Amino acid sequence: MHRGIPKSSKTQTHTQQDRPPQPSTELEETRTSRARHSTTSAQRSTHYDPRTSDRPVSYTMNRTRSRKQTSHRLKNIPVHGNHEATIQHIPESVSKGARSQIERRQPNAINSGSHCTWLVLWCLGMASLFLCSKAQIHWDNLSTIGIIGTDNVHYKIMTRPSHQYLVIKLIPNASLIENCTKAELGEYEKLLNSVLEPINQALTLMTKNVKPLQSLGSGRRQRRFAGVVLAGVALGVATAAQITAGIALHQSNLNAQAIQSLRTSLEQSNKAIEEIREATQETVIAVQGVQDYVNNELVPAMQHMSCELVGQRLGLRLLRYYTELLSIFGPSLRDPISAEISIQALIYALGGEIHKILEKLGYSGSDMIAILESRGIKTKITHVDLPGKFIILSISYPTLSEVKGVIVHRLEAVSYNIGSQEWYTTVPRYIATNGYLISNFDESSCVFVSESAICSQNSLYPMSPLLQQCIRGDTSSCARTLVSGTMGNKFILSKGNIVANCASILCKCYSTSTIINQSPDKLLTFIASDTCPLVEIDGATIQVGGRQYPDMVYEGKVALGPAISLDRLDVGTNLGNALKKLDDAKVLIDSSNQILETVRRSSFNFGSLLSVPILSCTALALLLLIYCCKRRYQQTLKQHTKVDPAFKPDLTGTSKSYVRSL
């Protein structure tokens, strides 16, 4: 059995010669493999195999290890009479071993994959933290030059508003007490006519001159482009807002039948608030100003009061209501088409029923307070009905949409002293951040409430790269300007600390009655409780908290930006000085060009004059050299010795061949 093992292992290694080697790290296994290699080398030398003769020793050692592993596996296999049966069990055992190795490698692969996943997530987290840190405003560096963040709010935009119509009946239905109040109602109608007729005339003029645009063709394509046209000749002078509002008025007055049915309903109604649903499924709220007073006060008192007293009470009530109408619709008398009425003024016309109106309109939620504070609800007069004495208002109430991730920051600048000059850093009053991006923020169309900035349009616009570097902490990129007069903040309270320019205002410690001095080399003074718990500054006594800012900021440690001018007069003066200096520089450049041209010409003439004697001297030197060389050659020829033809040399002792050659 032992002799058959090498044969089987040899057969196995021939079939598995393409399997990659499996190196081992154990010392004993290496020694055993070397011994096995030494014992089997003689057998392999007797059987020459061309496939293994040229292979390296490492391959042979790996084959030896595979034989050893196979021999260990064969020890657990029962002995069979037939040797071929033994060989048939070898691939099965090997496959089991391979499966066991794969099963052992699978959890390792899973662990390595999880490690790679965590590594990638960690890298992404660090990258996001790096970007966020780069994107954040560097408040510490900005505080050294007097820039302090005072507030940050969310950014919301008013989207396209929803429109709804509100009908206000200006005269109550007093049919039950008509006999006692006929005179008072007549006088009140005259007052209403003096208010409503100018508005009605302006609305009628605009709506009559806005007509449907008739299509020139009869085809479907031409009819699709039909709209409205404005008769500009009849209007005379009209602003863009009036023209736009006039077209809206025309569109709201197209359904005259609905207005007629509304008039009939209001004449028969005694309810103060009534919801009338028209065919267009638009909710119209009808409000009668003094109807509740008539129904709840005057009608029940008819049995206890005289008819004259009832009329007087109704007259006083109507006169008060008329005064309120004048205060509300006064701007509409001057511009009845494009004038807007705020919700705060409209509450008087609604008789104090603002909560019921909001409930009828279905407007509720956390944004209602913000809209009321921002005066987002607007109304316009769209129709005046003189016979029925009612007006129709178009209410537009917006929907707020918060822009996720955008934070609006408010910046305040505190002045600082450099020697005897007082400076302050010029930065925008509001900026916005969104991740890595920093942008300018135009607050002209925005209203700031407790936690939000509500804007009627997009207020974000790009910021210059230089200003972005300033906001991110590069103080050398922050421009500064001189303080003119009393402009600029001398101190500010931030994080419980006082950031003050004690060189320009008096800073006093109220607790110890000592003056807080600021040395000339300091820019600002940061006062906390460790310096003085109770500070008197600029006439105000402030109790400060723990230290949140550095004790002092020295001028030498801060890189200050360039100096600029913001005042119009200063800008104009500086611009004029710059232009004057440019003109002077141009004159100097022209004069320098003339001097250079003169020097160039003079240098050319001097060079030409200097070249003549140099060439003459060179020619004379060459001639002199030639003459000297010729004379030297002649002297050499004269000194040469001449041979006498009669001279015969002594040839004694010379060979005959040499003599013959001579």
From Swiss-Prot:
Q: Which GO terms of type biological process are on file?
A: fusion of virus membrane with host plasma membrane; symbiont entry into host cell
Compositionally biased spans, kind Basic residues: 64-73
**Transmembrane ranges?**
609-629
The UniProt entry, under Pfam families, shows: Fusion_gly
According to the UniProt record, where is the region Disordered?
1-73
Q: GO cellular-component terms in the record?
A: host cell plasma membrane; membrane; viral envelope; virion membrane
Record flagged with keyword DNA-binding: no
Q: Where is the composition biased (Polar residues)?
A: 8-19
Q: Topology: which residues are Extracellular?
A: 136-608
Identify the glycosylated residues: 141, 173, 179
Question: Which regions of this chain are Cytoplasmic-facing, per the record's topological domains?
Answer: 630-662
- Keyword list, A-Z: Cleavage on pair of basic residues, Coiled coil, Disulfide bond, Fusion of virus membrane with host cell membrane, Fusion of virus membrane with host membrane, Glycoprotein, Host cell membrane, Host membrane, Membrane, Signal, Transmembrane, Transmembrane helix, Viral envelope protein, Viral penetration into host cytoplasm, Virion, Virus entry into host cell
What's the subunit arrangement here?
A: Homotrimer of disulfide-linked F1-F2.
Similarity annotation: Belongs to the paramyxoviruses fusion glycoprotein family.
- State what protein this is by name: Fusion glycoprotein F0
The source organism is Canine distemper virus (strain Onderstepoort)
